[in-house]
């Protein structure tokens, strides 16, 4: 079982669209492979990678191109690709100067496309200069195609003008406005909106245009007009951005860009480029969503190994594995006692110099976070946005999964994920620790061959 991650050899990508068909992933990504990793947009079309395992793939060059007039500098913004009755349907937006076009395309095989520029009438309260970043969804109840786009209301440049519109069509050609889907007066811009349903619930996914750049979602029951915020509005942290959803064998998957750092530094800001990371979406009884690894653990082993750490006055830690390698999966159950201050698991740890990376849990703050430990001298790892709210209750057992693949790690706990990148490799140890309290770890399984 591997981290569900895709990155073409010798390049970074952004503006990705993804779907699943006939037991294969179809990944459409920006084709301008010569640009620097920190550059965004500017591509003239999309490459296609077809893969069964996200590791071995076949590339088709420039299968989707801009429909703007030849000779003008164009920027393509990602939309999505939907499978409907054995056909591929795609949408994306093209910017040429200040003009924006929404493009739709239809294909029998996902490689050869018929492309058309669509005409949309924006409501009078919206600015006619917008990035769109559309997404498609087929509503079975009404037999209508729904197209969701990002727009901006008219107003001062500094105002929170970002909004989301939705159009509908019965023939995939003529589009009429269905509703102003959301206008939260919260963001300057809203990017990559996506609309989808699970059972009686409707969901709105979007990326925020701000310093943390996370992927958020809102929910409502069918028939309702307003959106409600779930207990946790993000299913991953800062290291998953500009993504969407696709359907795989009856369930939904969340995907997005796992970015690299600018300036090749762990103090650098996050780039717009990287690789594609995928999570499996699970719906809770109250309509909230959670995420799990795409692949389940092949063998459900219990009681393989267990340990207890306790130090009321300070720190206690134990090296569980000394030679983990750079690709592995560890699953375990964790339980902590009341008044425990902090605990966690360290990866790429070097005990001799007390250096490594860690997923740590802070019960008093009800959060899990990724960090470099020790993060000094003041400081060496920028981890803003790399934390999640987690319900941490003393005496309760929590299943935890940590996946490591070279410079990438992903934590799954309590229905959320925290993805991260690690530029360095201080050591090769896997270590558990607790600070001012007691931690019991059980059913530990370490699979060094999980990622091939």
Stretches found by the model and what they are:
Residues 442-449:
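Extracellular beta-strand elements of beta-rich domains used
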Residues 376-399:
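Short, aromatic/His-centered strand-loop micro-motif at the edge of beta-sheets
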Residues 195, 330-332, 396-411:
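Short tryptophan-centered beta-strand motifs in secreted/extracellular beta-sheet-rich domains
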Residues 189-193, 239-243:
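Repeated scaffold domains used in trafficking and secretory/extracellular systems
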Residues 311-375:
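Secretory/extracellular carbohydrate-interaction modules
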